[in-house]
């Protein structure tokens, strides 16, 4: 990456940052989100998830996790399943992003599933690690392809839950061949 940026005339101005070296912080933030009520342990088995996906496919619907464990009080925790940690996405209203390229963008919160932020092995997903690391490095601008717009809506909800300042987002249209 560094050499590719140099080829473009963009000089590297700091230490290289390796995301996997910050896992302890990512896990700590996931645990804090649980304590604040913005995340939860999900004990769905792979079989359950696959059944849900197949059901959605048969109905011609995109898969969205059914939130079974979101507010679980009476469910028995399976002893043979390690949980993933899911972020509690907002259910109502809209999430709004002021994009520097595309202007104000919004999405209905009902279309954002409760996404996984920590896998069963406690490794963070992109949504959590990118958000935490950008915050830790005081990133002010996130510039990426517009295929990542949905990620920005999810990450904005994490920023809001943690009370962190949201960086400026700029989503650039991708170059597509004919």
Residue ranges and their predicted role:
Residues 15-17, 23-32, 46:
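Glycine-rich nucleotide/cofactor/substrate-binding loop typically near the N-terminus or early
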Residues 18-19, 35-178:
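Active-site cores that bind ATP or allylic diphosphates and position pyrophosphate for catalysis
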């Amino acid at each position: 990456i560094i050499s590719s940026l140099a080829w473009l005339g963009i000089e590297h101005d700091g230490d290289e940052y390796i995301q996997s070296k910050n896992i302890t912080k990512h896990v700590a933030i996931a645990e804090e989100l649980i304590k604040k009520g913005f995340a939860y342990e999900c004990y769905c088995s792979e079989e359950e998830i696959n059944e849900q996906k197949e059901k959605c496919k048969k109905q011609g619907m995109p898969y969205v996790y059914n939130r079974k464990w979101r507010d679980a009080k009476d469910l028995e925790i399976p002893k043979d399943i390690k949980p993933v940690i899911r972020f509690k996405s907002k259910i109502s209203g809209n999430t709004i992003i002021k994009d520097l390229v595309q202007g104000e963008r919004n999405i209905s919160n009902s279309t954002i599933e409760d996404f996984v932020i920590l896998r069963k092995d406690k490794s963070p997903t992109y949504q959590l690690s990118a958000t935490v690391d950008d915050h830790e490095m005081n990133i002010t601008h996130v510039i990426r392809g517009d295929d990542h717009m949905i990620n920005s809506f999810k990450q904005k909800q994490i920023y809001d839950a943690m009370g962190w300042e949201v960086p400026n987002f700029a989503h650039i249209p991708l170059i597509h061949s004919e």
